[in-house]
Amino acid sequence: MDKTLKFTESHEWVRDNGDGTVTIGISEHAQEMLGDVVFVELPELEAEIEAGESFSLVESVKAASDIYAPVTGEVVEVNEELSDSPELINEEPYEGGWIVKVKLSDPSELDNLKDAEEYLNSIEED
């Protein structure tokens, strides 16, 4: 796992792209709990997402799970690959399985997220 990633309590990850945008996906732990992903509902380009609000849906053979925005901002890119290959979320949760890229409204929101070590400790306690 990339140690520069930040995480939420609800198992989303955020990668700071260093240009005012972030990439968002779901963690290895989340995809393991979901099982085989069969469908991903992607938000619209230019949609405004708000920290703590649902912006996407991931359906697996076991369940459908809302994906919550870790930060507030504007969707600048969606991972179209997931339309044809939703299994990328299982196979490469931190690489090919990313969901959206977002232009941050407030970069300080990143400070509210857990670092990789804190996140790993929290899931070990579950």
Swiss-Prot record:
Keywords: Lipoyl
GO cellular component, as recorded: cytosol; glycine cleavage complex
Signal peptide: none
Single Gene Ontology BP annotation: glycine decarboxylation via glycine cleavage system
Keyword Disulfide bond attributed: no
Highest taxon, organism lineage: Bacteria
Cofactor: binding details: Binds 1 lipoyl cofactor covalently.
Role according to the record: The glycine cleavage system catalyzes the degradation of glycine. The H protein shuttles the methylamine group of glycine from the P protein to the T protein.
Protein's UniProt name: Glycine cleavage system H protein
